[in-house]
A protein has these predicted regions:
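Amphipathic alpha-helical "coupling" segments that flank catalytic cores
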Residues: 1-690
Length: 690
């Protein structure tokens, strides 16, 4: 049977860059699914896109579906029909499921069969509903109506091309009827252009100054950037997020180089980069030493012959942005950073939790607790409290109000300008770290104190007013904050504090402000929240679920302790299999026979020599395990437990535990209880698999 290609183009006003990229991903699964649901055989599906279009091309679609004759076996005849031969509900349901009347059922060999016939259908008659499903099936963050129509899409649709081979598919949506006429680049080749066959659509679009795929446009841009780098000796910064956006803003990208006045380089580098990347989608260029230059890359979407005009226009735009940035920076420097703190009373942190000034005071109070718990020096403690006092002050400066992504960074510059110590300035800059998974933590203990106080204040506050994460919803990114806190407690130079104690201190500060909440309930929620996040982190790091659950079974509340205990168990399992085997075996033998209700008060006078040896080993292990746990030396604790394998094996070999003498029997069971009791302070070894 002859096969044709399907080509479907949705022509629109410019779709937002990230929405376009997401729509392409959806169409890669949506289009084949709709064809499968319609029982239309097909070959490979290709998705193309530009800011003004989405294109679906599907190869190897037959002109008609296959005729089918099928036989389906149903229930037994005894179940399908009653004594009078009438179809039962079982027969009716079976027939209905196969799309036939119960009278058409056939009985053979004691069973009911349904014979169905599916005639061949011209595929062209089925495709209209498939195309409708494609348009309606794309999920958009925001969609809109236009004109007098009631249908929705990301942006107004201006044309459809719908071809099956050379035949136009009858299709109408939002008052627009599909035809064979596409459009090209809005300015370079507006069209319309006729498309004779589905296989030609993409090439017609390409010839009309449209690079029709995200991957191709990115390749064009990267090649242009590489050419600029080779000519200038500079290096471009291409953040992934900005690159995706630029790729989906231009249908026919051209890489150009612009410049700005060198005087603007007196402004902090971060604010210049923010102005270019975040506001204008320009890529900054750096010299060989990594220093920002006064040149930048702009990706044009116009006639390459007009490059000078495009560059001039973009230079005027960036000049205006940088003039504003320099003005704001200079104005902010006229006042010491501390003078901005009181203005934080005008900025709401959270409706029920007060202002940013309230938050600043809590951060400072929590920082006081943390420096004491961590045992920081007097100098570091003073710097931490000073940084806590100033860390949010730049939020009300003109530069940060205009360029929000440089919060913290500008505060650092302003702090240095008014004579704060380097450590205070650095802590202000870094207290938002880590911003995402894998991001660097603050470099100093002072920075970690302020960062942890800030994040923990947010978590405890939002939990106290019932705004903790639920399901997949986490509008305040509390999970990310929790991961950041755990990272600061487990990094190369960690902040050594009790997180549970810090949670108590944070909740106490909220209580002092008159925030009403159930302290015990919120405390429990927050601790469980951190433990849950830590469990996920361990699982994602490849740690055994059994090891994680074994440690959690002994009510560990500190994330750092959970991590270290699990790592010790995993290390023993991987690198010291004999130790791990001894742990598991020793525990299992005793745990299988113990009687917890008898307690562990052993009568030494009733012990034989072998029993006494085990009792002494247990007492010694209790002391050594306790010392190891106090020192957070979990590997040593495991070694001490594994050393009990010999005494317990000898005990089972030489001693009849279930003695007829009740006193002896119960005393031996108490000894086993005490033996197991040494283990339960470390982990529940019954949950471990070998």
């Amino acid at each position: 049977m002859a096969q044709q290609s399907l080509a479907f183009e949705i022509g629109t006003e410019e779709i937002p860059a990230f929405d376009l990229s997401n729509a392409v991903k959806q169409l890669k699964t949506l289009a084949p699914k709709l064809l499968d649901d319609a029982a239309i055989p097909h070959g490979e599906t290709q998705i193309y896109s530009s800011p003004r279009r989405l294109i679906v091309v599907v190869e190897d679609i037959p002109e008609a579906t296959e005729e089918k004759n099928e036989v389906f076996k149903g229930p037994s005849a005894k179940i399908a029909f009653d004594d009078e031969g009438n179809p039962t509900k079982a027969a009716q349901g079976f027939a209905r499921g196969k799309g036939i009347d119960p009278s058409e059922l056939v009985v053979e060999d004691g069973y009911v069969y349904a014979r169905t016939h599916t005639p061949s259908v011209k595929v062209a008659t089925l495709l209209s509903s498939v195309l409708d499903g494609i348009v309606r099936g794309i999920s958009w963050p925001k969609s809109q109506r236009w004109g007098a129509e009631s249908e929705y899409f990301s942006r107004p649709i201006r044309w459809f091309v719908a071809l099956f081979g050379s035949e136009v598919i009858p299709f109408t949506f939002a008052g627009l009827t599909a035809d064979r006429f596409t459009r090209g680049h809005r300015f370079l080749a507006p069209g319309p252009f006729s498309v004779d066959n589905a296989d030609e659509l993409v090439e017609v679009v390409r010839n009309a100054y449209v690079v029709p795929s995200e991957a191709e446009r990115e390749e064009v841009i990267r090649a242009g950037v590489a050419e600029v780098e080779a000519k200038t000796g500079f290096k471009a910064e291409l953040p992934a997020k900005t690159l995706v956006e630029v790729v989906n803003l231009a249908e026919y990208p051209t890489v150009l180089v612009g410049t700005f006045d060198k005087e603007f380089l007196q402004v902090p580098e971060e604010i210049i980069v923010d102005a270019m990347l975040m506001h204008q989608r320009y890529f900054p260029l750096y010299d060989e030493a990594g220093k920002l230059t006064n040149r930048f890359i702009v990706v044009g979407n116009g006639d390459p012959a007009c490059s000078d005009t495009i560059i001039d226009g973009n230079e005027r735009v960036v000049r205006a942005r940088l003039y504003d940035a320099k003005f704001f920076y200079d104005e902010d420097l006229k006042r010491p950073l501390e003078s901005y703190v009181d203005q934080l009373a005008e900025v709401v942190f959270q409706e029920k939790l007060g202002t940013m000034l309230d938050k600043t005071n809590r951060i400072k109070g929590l920082a006081q607790h943390l420096v004491e718990d961590a045992g920081l020096s007097q100098t570091d403690s003073q710097d931490a409290l000073r940084a806590a006092q100033l860390c949010k002050a730049d939020l009300v400066t003109s530069a940060v109000i205009e360029f929000t992504s440089v919060q913290g960074v500008m505060g650092s510059y302003y702090a240095s300008a008014c004579g704060e110590t380097d450590q205070v300035a650095q802590a202000i800059e870094q207290h938002y770290r880590p911003r995402f998974a894998g991001d660097e933590v603050p470099e100093t203990a002072v920075g970690k104190v302020v960062a942890l106080a800030d994040k923990l204040d947010t978590i405890c506050g939002l939990f106290s007013v019932g705004q903790g994460p639920s399901g997949s919803s986490d509008p305040f990114a509390l999970r990310r904050s929790a991961i950041g806190i755990v990272a600061m407690l487990t990094c190369e130079n960690p902040l050594t504090i009790s997180l549970v104690s810090a949670i108590d201190a944070s909740l106490a500060l909220y209580a002092q402000e008159g925030i009403e909440f159930d302290h015990d309930a919120v405390r429990k929620e927050v601790i469980e929240f951190f433990i849950t996040r830590t469990r996920v982190m361990l699982r994602d790091a490849g740690k055994g679920i059994d090891a994680i659950d074994a440690v959690l079974a002994v009510d560990v509340q500190e994330p750092v302790e959970l991590i270290h205990r699990v790592e010790a168990l995993e290390a023993a399992r991987k690198h010291e299999p004999e130790t791990f085997e001894n742990l598991a075996t020793a525990y299992a033998r005793a745990n299988n026979l113990r009687e917890p209700k008898l307690g562990s008060d052993v009568d030494e006078n009733l012990l034989s020599e072998v029993e006494h040896a085990l009792s002494c080993a247990v007492v010694q292990a209790e002391n050594r395990v306790a010392l190891a746990l106090d020192a957070d030396n979990y590997a040593e604790a495991l070694q001490e437990l594994a050393a009990l394998r010999g005494p317990i094996d000898l005990f089972f070999e030489r001693v009849m535990i279930m003695d007829e003498d009740q006193a002896l029997r119960e005393n031996r069971l108490k000894l086993l209880n005490r033996f197991v009791g040494v283990f339960v302070h470390v982990a529940d070894f019954s949950l471990l698999s070998k």
